[in-house]
Regions:
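Functional surface patches built around histidine and acidic residues
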Residues: 1-135
């Protein structure tokens, strides 16, 4: 169940959708993150609704034209990605192969996580914002 949220972007009006806990991609991110942690000998992270709300809000701010950086972060830590990254496994693979993102994923002090994802399909292809928040 995707909720269509239209935004007037610089390139024109695009139709954006966000995922939530009813979507398999939401849980696939957690599964992939926890597999990366397990390979590093770490405990799995529990999904947290408040952290997911924060991750979703970060993605929404990117869609609305906010700076794509970590300023204004409201959680202990976050990882973000943007571009034509259409699947949970693809974005998690990207994060796993980035030393800074991998360091966040494998931070042993984290016990919970949240997931946000907003995407748009255009004539040029799919564009996606992903955020995972940690605590």
């Amino acid at each position: 169940s995707y909720g269509a949220v239209p935004f007037d972007l610089a390139a024109g009006t695009e139709q954006w959708w966000s995922i939530d806990s009813s979507d398999s991609a939401y849980w696939a991110v957690q599964e992939n993150i926890n597999a990366i942690r397990a390979a590093a000998g770490l405990s799995p992270l529990a999904m947290d609704g408040g952290l997911s709300a924060a991750a979703d809000a970060r993605c929404e701010s990117f869609v609305a034209g906010g700076a794509f950086d970590h300023s204004g972060m409201t959680t202990r830590s976050e990882i973000c990605a943007a571009g034509p990254i259409g699947s949970a496994s693809s974005v998690c693979s990207y994060w796993q192969n980035s030393p800074a993102h991998y360091a966040n994923i494998t931070n042993a002090s984290f016990t919970s996580m949240g997931v946000g994802c907003w995407f748009c399909s255009t004539a040029e292809g799919q564009y996606t914002y992903w955020t995972v928040t940690f605590n």
